[in-house]
Amino acid sequence: MNHWFDARSKWGRAAIAAAVFIVALATYCFTLAPTVTFVDSGELIAAARTLGVAHPPGTPLYIILAHLATLIPIGNVAQRVNFASALFAALAAAAVALLVGEMLRTPSTRQSSVRGEKKKRAKRAAAERNKEAAGDQSSDAAMTTIAAMLVSGLLLTFSRTLWSYATIAEVYTLNVMLTLSIFLLMFRWRRLSKETRERGDRAPHYRLLYAAAFLYGLAMGVHHVTIVLTLPALAFLVYSTEGFGFFKSKRLIYAALLAVAGLAIYVYLPVAASRSPLINWGDPKTFERFWWHVTGRQYQTFFSFSLDTMAGQLKEFARFAANQFGGPWLSLAGLGLTVAGFVEMFKRDKTVFFFFALVIIADLAIALNYDIAEDKDAYYLPVFISMTVATGFGAQWLIRTILKTKLRATLARAASALALLLVVAMTFAGNLRHNDRSRYFLARDYVENLFSTIEPGGMLLTLDWQVYSPMLYVSDIEQQRRDVVAIDVNQLRRSWYFDYLNRTYPEVMERNRDTVAPFLEDLKSWEKDPEAYTKNSTLSARIDSRFRDMILALVSNQIRTAPVYITNDIITIYSFIAEIQRRNKDAQASAYHQDGSWIMPLCDMYTLVPQGLVFQFSTDREFREPARPALLTRGLADGTMRFEEDDVVKQKVLPVYLGMMVNRGRYLMAHGRREQAIEAFNEALQIDPQFEPARQSLFQVPQAAPR
């Protein structure tokens, strides 16, 4: 066998990993998103480009590396950061191939359990084997290792979740790459330590352990939640290799110090904050604010250790897991290989089995109790990594099983290769349409469509992160429509955001200083001691009142000189509360939604005129011709892209397009513009023929027509 692809040699394993890396990187580059995407992409790109501070926990290592990517003079800034994700994911795929190869190099516990005469007889039997047969067996062993490395590497490459984050600006692929690199170093240290002891040497390979410790600290600077969850498994691996003695030795202190040295990457946060960058989330200059930011204080409310939450999340996890290798049906082969791999892992090396069992248990214990709307599948990546590692063991088991049949050796090898190739091909085919973002202009088009009907100098209020995050990129990085005053009302509940507004819209903030200053004073007090406001109804009422007054003033002061717009999500809340109050006149708006106290009076003060994808406030009730812009809808509903049912496009973006078309039609219908109303309803039905509000509204048009 050519030593370049011989899994028994160092260069052979490196060549296999390199092949996986090349395939992975090529796949990700061909399916790379050409611009900004939804969720956190826009904010992360803006923070990286300006060396700012991203949302908690700040992910300093990612921001620094992504910033370096933005300096590459190829493509737009978003493409460069998207490519960084692709590079990290490709390296992760290569790392998992090396990890599987490393674990298969460690002698099986079944082999190492042979003692005394059994061991001697085994040696004599081995010496008496026919050289040709020995050569065949050696070749088969090398082939199974090659197959295991390739299968695990390629299945991780094409797995749905990793691939989905490999084509956009997100932190998770870097996190996976570092996690697998730590695992690789630790298992190599374990093997070399065992070999050292067997030879009777006294020079254990602690450099690998220390390197893993330093890398662990660095990895904490990306997505520390999932990294921390690997600690029980890593501690178990150390114990199984060194025993309790390690935890009493200076080596533990050295490893801990190196991990802390890696953690020093977090010094970036206060240093960056002191520069007052454009994106300075949390403004972590002081130790107190730094601690709030790193610990993700604002997200801790998403944790709910209840059986109901776990039951719902478990169903969601099962769906994610079933789709990893191509979809509910296509995944059966990959999942079967995973199960077989875990069984083989248990038989071959129980330490490896329990290591990954601990990774899975720790991850599920937290992820099943963390209820967030987006990126939920990313929190299960440690489980999916473990599944992919198991497929490598499963591939080895499958080949050995086929080789033991009565098939001729050549035919058996061909059958094994074909079976494994089929598993990889099905995973690729099943996940390609879900993860091909080479024509993903949805977020960029969304922002363009929103801007298209906002007049120069207009103000836009939104509660929708899918609007605001990509808008940060388009406005602050690409410098488009800098005249638009875009405000995320959710972020008005964070004091750091006012620094951003003061820098970006100084005239607007100066004009509203009288209402902003009192609220900001209360807000900073609330941030220090939210419990005090919860317990004290007077304080709670005061901060709510000041928040409402500030928003009403922002709108009333702006509308004197320029138009003001709001996004559809605000009207959805308004309609929801209005319906409750229609049934119960004594109902308090704030009791049904935290934004009710300002949404209801604001929307009651003005007439709402649908303009494209937004509503414009009007101070009178006269009819205003609603804008009918030529909306960019590339990939939205033309069949060129496929979205999961829980995808943000289906859940939040598409409903805005459809809903605003219907709102325009209803507005026109209310003012006797029958033909125009019909056109608006039909536009919605062209995108989604089953959209019930459009169908119902279209049915009602003749009844609303003048008689």
Model-assigned labels for residue ranges:
Residues 1-12, 103-144, 193-207, 244-246, ...:
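Membrane-interfacial, low-structure loops and terminal tails that flank and connect transmembrane helices
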Residues 14-27, 150-154, 258-260, 358-359:
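Alpha-helical transmembrane segments
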Residues 29-30, 75-82, 116-120, 136-142, ...:
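Aromatic- and kink-enriched transmembrane "portal" helix at the membrane-lumen/periplasm boundary
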Residues 32-44, 54-65, 278-283, 438-443:
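Extracytoplasmic catalytic/substrate-binding loops of multi-pass membrane glycan-assembly enzymes
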Residues 48-76, 86-87:
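Short hydrophobic/aromatic helix or loop-helix immediately within or flanking a transmembrane segment
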Residues 66-70, 81-104, 108, 155, ...:
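Transmembrane alpha-helices of multi-pass, membrane-embedded glycan-processing enzymes
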Residues 83-135, 181-185, 339-340, 389-393:
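Transmembrane-helix motifs of polytopic, lipid-linked glycan transferases
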Residues 101, 168-169, 173-176, 181, ...:
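ER/secretory pathway lumenal C-terminal domains and tails of membrane proteins involved
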